[in-house]
Amino acid sequence: MNKKGFTLIEVLVSLVILAIIAVISSNILKSSLETERITSEQLESIKELSLASSIIRRDVRQLVNVNSRDFYGNNENGTLISEINTQNLIFNTSIKSISDQISPIKRVEYILDGNNFIKKQFFSSNPFSPDDYTKIELIKNVSNLTISFLHKDTWHQSWPINLETSKKIPVLIKIEFFKDNKNYSWILDPNITHALQN
C-alpha cells in the first residue's frame, strides 16, 4: 500500500527540529538585544563624559584671574575658590556672548549636587543674586568626587591655601570621581602663571 503523505513520526521529528531552531534563534536574538543595550549605555556614558570633559577643560583654559565678589559685594578670598570638603570649584571664565555689549567674563561653579556633577553659569562675573544662573547637568550618578590643586609640587584639597595663593591659579587641577564601577581622573592645566596684581 503506497500512501502519499507524512507519518506521525515524521511530523513530530519536524516539529522538534523547528522548536530547537526557534529556541536557538530566540536566544541569539535575546543575546543580541542585551549586547545592543549594554553597548548603547556605554556609548551614552562615553558621550556624557566626553562632553563634560570638554566643557570643564574649555572653562579652565579660558579662566580669568580677576577679583571676585560674593553676593553682597564683599571681596572673595581668592580668584579661584574651592573650600575643603565642599566638592565644588568656583572661578571666572571668558564665555562668548551673543552681544558685544555684554561682558564675556562669567562666574562658573562646578559642584556635586546629590549624585550629579553640574555646572552653574552665572550671568556676570560678580552676580548679585545666588539664583541668577543657568544649570547644566554634566555627569549623572557620580560618587566620591574630589578636587585637588597642585602648588609647589604638592596636591592640596582646597584653594586658595594661603594669602599668597589667593591671587594665583594652581599649576594643575585634578578632578577624581567614581561612576559606573570605574574611577576617573582628569588633570586640567589652567596655564596661567601670573598672579593677580592689585
Across the structure, where does each feature detected by a protein language model lie?
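A short, polar/proline- and glycine-enriched secondary-structure boundary/capping micro-motif
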Residues: 102, 127-136, 158, 186-187, ...
